[in-house]
Amino acid sequence: MTRYVLSPAAQADLEDIWRYSVERWSSAQAERYVLAIRDACDDLASGAQAGQDAGDIRDGYRKLRVGSHVLFFRRSGAVIDVVRILHQRMDLASRL
């Protein structure tokens, strides 16, 4: 069974997203948004989502958009390694 793992950078991204969402909207909205991101990671692991090739940004990477954010990940055997979770307006290439 495939599983997903958040890199330390992706975990920090998720915490930043939660914190920003609480400050900007509410803790309830932050929980819903972070849950949507985690659900997308589950979908990647289950095969319900495959994402798109992100080789134009970094070789071997794939991406999946969730709300205003983009999950960057690599598939390695039975593991989906979520590398970063970045806002779509960021300079993505420089942060990977």
Each language-model region and where it sits:
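Short, hydrophobic secondary-structure boundary micro-motifs
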Residues: 30, 52-54, 94
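Short amphipathic alpha-helical/adjacent loop interface patches that line ligand
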Residues: 14, 18, 34, 38-41, ...
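Short proline/glycine- and basic residue-enriched helix-capping loop/turn segments at helix->loop/beta transitions
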Residues: 42-46
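Amphipathic, hydrophobic secondary-structure cores in small proteins
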Residues: 21-24, 33-34, 38, 54-61, ...
